[in-house]
Amino acid sequence: MRRVCFWAVCLLGWLPARAQELRTVPERTDYEATSRYEDVVAFLQAVTRGSDFLHLRWLDSTVEGRRLPLVIAARGLDPDPQAIARSGRLVVYIQGTIHAGEVEGKEAILELVRALRDGKHAHWLNRLVLLWLPMLNADGNERISPNNRPFQHGPVRGMGQRPNARGLALNRDHMKLESPEIRAFVSLLRRYDPAVTLDLHTTNGSFHGYHLTYSGPLNPNTDPELMRWMRQAFFPQIQHRMAQAGFRTYYYGNFERRDGQEVWATFSHEPRFNNNYVGLRNRIPILSEAYAYIPFRDRIAVTAAFVRAVLDYLTEQADRVQQLIQQAEQHAIALGRSGRDSLGVRFALVRSSERTTILKGAVRTEENPYSGRPMYRLVEDSVRAVEMPEYQAFQATIRERLPRAYYLPPEVASVVLPLLEAHGARL
């Protein structure tokens, strides 16, 4: 009897300890620090070890030679692209740290992959295949300093830098493909063809009252039905679910002055940005921007909640999403063959027909205990609703008829053709 009790006590003591072994760097440091490259790799190796549905794979290397770890969550499937395509499941790609100072996406991804391993959110894998890339800008992630991202509220021991090792802002490189990191991302799009992509960021700038803001595609040449569904069905549902979880969310924007008054305005239509590039490929892009002036712990929490809400809804709407994408593909092919339609080549922001209620918030200044520099923190009691004009959509101001063919002079063909092939164009 004593021997049985002894082993029972040992087992009970071992189980909680083992469950606590796999913790993220923020969890181990009371949210003072973020994960370095070796931390992320070790975590993903541990979380996938022995799993029959979590598979660790690697994308091409960064400027400084770091391979990018990718976790594929696929139940009952070989994780190769062909098997995933044959499964008929909706493929969703979730990406963190394209700007390496914006680190909560990376940490939220690690937490969510661990939750999947532990049996949570199992319903996602009935309809979805999930591709998790916590750290796209791995070189920038290693340049951790408390002086990066001035005024951001943590992590107080520092975060990575915005550009990659060559000084390129990766979220401006989706057309030129000058960086190995974005080339690896576009290669992933071509191989796995995710229907939906999530790009997880931290805001800069305006003192608003939201925990997180979001955006879909903004280029008017994006398939209109995809854009309509995101504005009328998808984002309203996500906003509702986030409110139920206790988070204030809204469309991404900043305060600007236009025509002598304050307005809420979105950012850019340019395809060099991830959300616009993916949208122009007839896929569904989702941009997430956690508020820089809420604590690091809270930014991880709201980002993880946003991803959960998105994946829950996509699980419910997988058939509808696949239908929308198929229709967008057919529509694009028909337009190209007809030669009768046109595309926008110049664009302008459009003012909303009615004034919109936007949340504003004040911040207080706190001192970073490691650098001594000021950090801003949202004062929750200061959040208030203000009506103002909104600029959330672009319209074409100049359009050009779709060409039937392109002529490339020999002196530029050697540059242009490899770039088109890298994007997946059939030549």
What positions do the PLM features span?
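Hydrophobic h-region of N-terminal signal peptides that target proteins for export
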Residues: 10-18
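Bacterial N-terminal signal peptides that target proteins for export
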Residues: 1-6
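Acidic/histidine-rich, surface-exposed loop or edge segments in extracytoplasmic proteins
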Residues: 20-31, 94-96, 168-169, 396-402
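Active-site/substrate-binding loop(s) of hydrolase catalytic cores
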Residues: 85-96, 103-262, 266-272
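Active-site-proximal beta-strand/loop segments in catalytic clefts of secreted hydrolases
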Residues: 59-61, 73-75, 96-98, 133-137, ...
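Soluble metallo-hydrolase cores and metallopeptidase-like ectodomains found primarily
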Residues: 38-92
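Hard-cation-handling environments
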Residues: 255-427
